Swiss-Prot record:
<dbReference type="InterPro" id="IPR041027">
    <property type="entry name" value="FtsK_alpha"/>
</dbReference>
<keyword id="KW-0812">Transmembrane</keyword>
<dbReference type="GO" id="GO:0005886">
    <property type="term" value="C:plasma membrane"/>
</dbReference>
<feature type="region of interest" description="Disordered">
    <location>
        <begin position="701"/>
        <end position="722"/>
    </location>
</feature>
<keyword id="KW-0132">Cell division</keyword>
<keyword id="KW-0131">Cell cycle</keyword>
<comment type="subunit">
    <text>Homohexamer. Forms a ring that surrounds DNA.</text>
</comment>
<dbReference type="InterPro" id="IPR050206">
    <property type="entry name" value="FtsK/SpoIIIE/SftA"/>
</dbReference>
<keyword id="KW-1133">Transmembrane helix</keyword>
<dbReference type="Pfam" id="PF17854">
    <property type="entry name" value="FtsK_alpha"/>
</dbReference>
<dbReference type="GO" id="GO:0007059">
    <property type="term" value="P:chromosome segregation"/>
</dbReference>
<feature type="compositionally biased region" description="Basic residues">
    <location>
        <begin position="1"/>
        <end position="20"/>
    </location>
</feature>
<feature type="compositionally biased region" description="Polar residues">
    <location>
        <begin position="231"/>
        <end position="272"/>
    </location>
</feature>
<dbReference type="GO" id="GO:0051301">
    <property type="term" value="P:cell division"/>
</dbReference>
<keyword id="KW-0547">Nucleotide-binding</keyword>
<dbReference type="InterPro" id="IPR036388">
    <property type="entry name" value="WH-like_DNA-bd_sf"/>
</dbReference>
<feature type="transmembrane region" description="Helical">
    <location>
        <begin position="64"/>
        <end position="84"/>
    </location>
</feature>
């Protein structure tokens, strides 16, 4: 019972109050201090009575003219302290950054104050005296600048750095305070600033282009109007048989003969195009003064009657082309840093240490240039292409290892947002090359730089790519680029289009030697006519003892200046074949022979070829054609085999299509990736119609292919497909009364394919019979009566 009572006895509780803890006392103290500080700050801001003036002078002594900002910040801090009983819990970045920014602001306030007072020493004492004077007068009339805090900083910076240095120090401290406060990475800030400046620059550039476009159009119209009036006056006042006065009259006016060219150059874009105007002025000067013709630059392709024919010809303006708005690729900039990190991390996981040295954002791909660590094999990076594509979630990527001329490895990653390269933009950005009439812009490389191809340096170009890869657009870009840079007397075209739908739009322009050739048999004959023209030109070179077309044209100019005649100079000839595979299927031997001869000898004669095909197989692009066409342009293909057929290396199978190409001109070891320019069919028609409105087509009768010529080729004309050994082979077979391919190979020392074609041709013409397996062919042609005794005597 005693134990039970002990357990049920109630425990006594103390009724005394607990003493306040240390935290509660601290919070109460904070509340009181906050209340007092809040009251003092309010009195200072409102300047209530003498007490308020005293408190206001206290804040002015510290912060000077910025005392209201200082008091406002103090009010916020004291209000927080009064409510929560503790100081605001801010990180050290906010405290340090905020105080540093406010100090920089006070330092800037000191500069106008002391410049106004013209006082440059003892800044602290002067500020303190001004504060005492205001306090004694009971007012705030004096300019205190940045107060005692600002005066303390100014007394250090001014003797060392003067006012300019003080301003720079203050601005640097402000920027540093922002970085400290918000913990901003420097490279991200610079990248954001760069994007903002680029957008601003693009807007300013668009406005400037619009304004200059309007001015150029008005100036061009005025110049063309003046030129028309000058030409009308010259044609009515001067005799057509007098060459010198006809060119002298326009030269006396301000616009002169160069007005059409200068008008075109004024509209086409860049300030460098003004060089074309100078070149046009030189073209008029030899006619005005024949004695000065020997000093004319060799690039002038028009003299005598040709200059008079082209005097009114105006080059097409870039305003005829559609202006495509630029694509916003700001999202691509945002992914550059993350992709760079993914590349280094992925390669590091495979034991390959690299460092991203440079990144180039192009129209269709972004190129990351990596520097491998010492001991890293290049092949190891190349073998990880699929793993890198997986890490970047890319469709496909191309690795250039190493980059020519650099100790870096290039990784080209496709962009999610592809920027279209406008043909008008690259035409306006192309610098003027009066000495390079065959220079045409192709597009832009992965760094955004303009890529210009010079046909005279190539000298022949092979284009290959699958359907829809941009091959036909590239051909239109090159042809239109030549039409916009040259006159009909400078460049002539031979266009061959077996598909009949790609190049037909150019029919009727004065630059054509013949209408667009669409039949394969006529195309083979047309190529042989170009070969004949090449041989004719070499005969002219031999007679004049010149080595190439430029030297011959210069020689003709000198002769014209000496005797007053007007001998024509030779224009460039550009042969364009849009589908080589179709020609090789129908007339392979004739086409191949003509292409090989032109490839070997046509450069010095001023004849250049552009061959395009969508089937880059070895039976179309034969070894002889590849050997004689050194410059290549590969678009997207289906396999690495096709890529190796075009450019002798892989890479074209990884292209994106839509103008993405690998361009390898003669002399370049590795191909250059280029995003080709885009030109619409409407733009091509606009340029063609502009040219047709000025001149009509004047075809060369010697280059026209007639129907009877193709019929003669089918009947066995030796110049149109019959082998040169055919007649001798017929005599041999008739004499021996047996026919075999091996016999022709041994006797004429020719290859199997050629000998087999001769035997097949004899079979078609009824000379020999068909093949009967292992039995010899029957010979239908018998020896004549005169041949039989002769052969018997020989035996």
């Amino acid at each position: 019972m005693a134990r039970r009572q002990a357990t049920t006895k109630k425990r006594r509780t103390s009724t005394r109050k607990k003493k306040p803890t240390v935290a509660a006392k601290r919070q109460m103290t904070g509340n009181v201090i906050g209340l007092i500080g809040l009251l003092v700050t309010i009195l200072a801001l409102l300047k209530v009575g003498l007490v308020g003036m005293v408190f206001a002078e206290f804040f002015r002594a510290i912060a000077g003219n910025a005392y209201q900002i200082f008091a406002g910040l103090t009010l916020l801090v004291m209000g927080y302290l009064m409510i929560f009983g503790r100081w605001p819990r801010l990180t050290w970045r906010w405290w340090v950054g905020g105080n540093l920014f406010f100090f920089s602001y006070l330092l800037l306030l000191e500069i106008p104050m002391f410049n106004q007072l013209n006082h440059h020493t003892d800044f602290w004492s002067l500020t303190w005296n001004l504060i005492k004077n205001d306090f004694a007068k009971g007012g705030m009339a004096s300019n205190l600048g940045g107060g005692l805090v600002g005066a303390a900083g100014y007394s250090v910076t001014y003797p060392l750095l003067a006012n300019v240095g003080t301003i720079l120090i203050a601005l640097i401290l402000m920027v540093a305070s922002i970085y400290i406060t918000f913990d901003l990475p420097f490279h991200k800030t610079m990248q954001a600033l760069r994007q903002a400046l680029m957008q601003l620059g693009q807007q300013l550039r668009s406005g400037y282009e619009w304004l200059t476009h309007v001015l150029r159009v008005q100036i061009a119209r005025w110049r063309v109007h003046q030129q028309v009036r000058a030409n009308q006056a010259a044609s009515t006042e001067k005799q057509p048989t007098s060459t010198v006065p006809q060119s002298a009259a326009p030269a006396e006016t301000t616009s002169g003969t160069s007005a059409p060219d200068s008008a075109a150059s004024a509209v086409t874009s860049s300030p460098a195009d003004l060089n074309i105007t100078v070149a046009s002025d030189r073209e008029a000067s030899p006619i005005k003064s024949p004695t000065s013709a020997a000093t004319v630059d060799h690039e002038q392709e028009l003299q005598g009657t040709e200059v008079m024919d082209d005097a009114d010809y105006q080059l097409p303006e870039s305003t005829l082309l559609t202006k495509i708005p630029k694509t916003d690729q700001s999202a691509e900039y945002a992914t550059i840093e993350s992709n760079s990190q993914k590349l280094t991390t992925t390669l590091a996981s495979f034991g390959v240490q690299v460092e991203v040295k440079n990144v180039s954002l192009g129209p269709s791909v972004t190129k990351y240039e990596l520097h491998p660590a010492v001991g890293v094999k290049v092949s190891k990076v190349v073998n990880l292409a699929d793993d890198l594509a997986l890490a970047l979630a890319a469709k496909d990527l191309r690795i250039e290892a190493p980059i020519p001329g650099k100790s870096l490895i290039g990784i080209e990653v496709p962009n999610k947002q592809i920027s279209t390269v406008s043909f008008r933009d690259i035409v306006e950005a192309q610098p003027a090359h009066p000495t390079k009439p065959l220079a045409v812009p192709l597009g832009r490389d992965v760094s955004g730089n303009l890529v210009v191809a010079d046909l005279s340096k190539m000298p022949h170009l092979l284009i290959a790519g699958s359907t829809g890869s941009g091959k036909s657009v590239a051909i239109n870009v090159m042809i239109t680029g030549l039409l916009m840079n040259t006159k009909p007397s400078q460049v002539k075209f031979m266009l061959i289009d077996p598909k009949k739908v790609e190049l037909g739009v150019y029919n009727g322009i004065p630059h054509l030697l013949t209408p667009v050739v669409t039949e394969p048999k006529k195309a083979a004959r047309a190529l042989h006519k170009v070969v004949a023209e090449m041989e004719r030109r070499y005969e002219l070179f031999a007679d004049s003892k010149q080595r190439n077309m430029q030297g011959y044209n210069q020689y003709i100019r000198q002769q014209n200046a000496a005797d007053g005649q007007s001998r024509p100079v030779l224009p460039y000839i550009v042969v364009v074949v849009d589908e080589l595979a179709d020609l090789m299927m129908v007339t392979s031997s004739e086409v191949e022979d003509a292409i090989i001869r032109l490839g070997q000898m046509a450069r010095a004669a001023g004849i250049h070829m552009i061959l395009a095909t969508q089937r880059p197989s070895v039976d179309v692009i034969t070894g002889l054609i590849k050997a004689n066409v050194p410059s290549r342009m590969a678009f997207a293909v289906s396999s690495g085999t096709d890529s190796r057929t075009i450019i002798d290396s892989n890479g074209a199978e990884k292209l994106l299509g839509r103008g993405d190409m690998l361009y390898q001109p003669m002399g370049m070891n590795k191909p250059l990736r280029v995003q080709g320019a885009y030109i619409s069919d409407h733009d091509v028609e606009e340029v063609v119609n502009f040219i047709k409105a000025q001149q009509t087509a004047d075809y060369d009768d010697s280059m026209l292919v007639k129907d009877d010529e193709t019929d003669a080729a089918g009947s066995g004309d030796p110049r149109d497909g019959e082998d040169e050994y055919y007649a001798e082979a017929v005599e041999l077979v008739t004499d021996q009364q047996s026919a075999s391919v091996s016999m022709l190979q041994r006797r004429f020392r020719i290859g199997y394919n050629r000998a087999a074609r001769i035997v097949d041709e004899m079979e078609e013409r009824g000379v020999v019979g068909p093949s009967e397996g292992s039995k010899p062919r029957k010979v239908y042609r018998q020896k004549s009566a005169d041949e039989a005794p002769a052969s018997g005597n020989d035996a």
